[in-house]
Amino acid sequence: MPRDSKSSFNFQDLMLHRIHEILLVASPYDSFILEEDGRLTQQILYEYLGMNLSYAPRVWHAKNATTGLKMLSDRSYDLVIVMMRIADMDPITFGEKVKAEYPDKPIVLLAFDESEITSLPQERMQKSIDKVFIWSGNANLFPAVIKNFEDKMNFKRDYKIADIRAIILVEDNPRYYSVILPLIYRTALLHARDLISKSLSDTDRLLLFRARPKIILVSTYEEAIKYYDDYRHNILGFISDVRFPKNNELDDHAGIKLAEYIRQKDSDMPIILQSTNPHHNEDATAINASFIHKKSSSLLQELEDFIINNFGFGDFIFRNKRGKEISSASDLKSLKKSLNKIPDKTLEYHASKNHFSNWLAVRGEFSIASIIRPLKVIDFNTLDDLRKLIIEQIDMSLKANNEGRIVQYSSTTKDKSLNFVRLSTGSLGGKARGLAFAINLLSESKIDKKYNNIKLRV
């Protein structure tokens, strides 16, 4: 079972499996295009170092398949990216040779156009290539590919350790997921970067990066159903195509069937369906799902708006029944303040859509999110009872977050409940070290739980 709170695990336990070394097998011309047009190395460094992550992967180039196989035998690589146009071997044969020696090595086939991969033997490709991506000049694709493989490797373990959340993208068309995946990661990481400035401590900053929602890309009905059945309460929502494989055959209504399956157990799970057929809008409405036309000129903007409004990214925006904003919250304190004054109808609307649990989970507040997630409005005699429960959980989390912590002073930390505040940078002095240690001992001992009506503070 997942642990109860973010304080019960070490942030270093998360994201154990990393991609550090990447082998790019590409012709000199393709390598040049990627570096000049896509700024491959520059973009990877920018994305990782810009997020204060010190493990930016290194990219090693091999000009042909023979050189690539030799380099694989000389050192270890975490990910292999092979381009379509390599001189001495087709990419499928290269993938087969790599898989024969290193069966668990992830291999990505990168093409410049979708038409390039239609002539490839599909059955052989499925066994030798883990994923196909289409390069369209978007430099954000490379960090998204890297992070997506890391997420898939780490999700099961991080779920058990820390109750991590996930967003499921169901799409079998490489052209579309090569565009959508970078958008989701950009939204998630920009959100994490924004939260960093509002965090109380260095530990919180690192936790927020490692505890961000995982983005899981699947391409079949069966894969999507398995993730839903196994991790139902930890899924923030689904972004799904309508037409993709089911029972090893393309099904024109697979996305509709997936949404119907989810709705049988979960009436509030955020789902957005995408299709080139605008008539599926009616099908989506019938099962309480949102819809985006894939050929819409505002596809990416509509998708980003859905992600921010339904998956907990950005400030919490309270709205009335007409959709008008009536209040907003950027952290737990302002969320509590707003909860005390919003109308019952607004509370009911957001509670019924899982907005509270998703917003809290994205911020690493897994304990509250896990408590609130399964609750339904009908479980309470009055909406005030629901309001009180959420506020009580927020109070408990605020107290737990502050216990035994040395908090950096800022305009957002002026709170009488804080035990210990650091006014400037540098090491603590002797007296301060002793006081900080005493606070830490009291916090770890949980002595206040042993004796009722007693408050111990330094």
Where are each of the predicted segments found?
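As written
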Residues: 91, 121-132, 283-291
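Hydrophobic/aromatic residues positioned on beta-strands within the core alpha/beta folds
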Residues: 109-112, 273-274, 294
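Conserved structured core elements
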Residues: 252, 256, 278, 297, ...
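Nuclease catalytic cores that cleave nucleic-acid phosphodiester bonds
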Residues: 259, 276-287
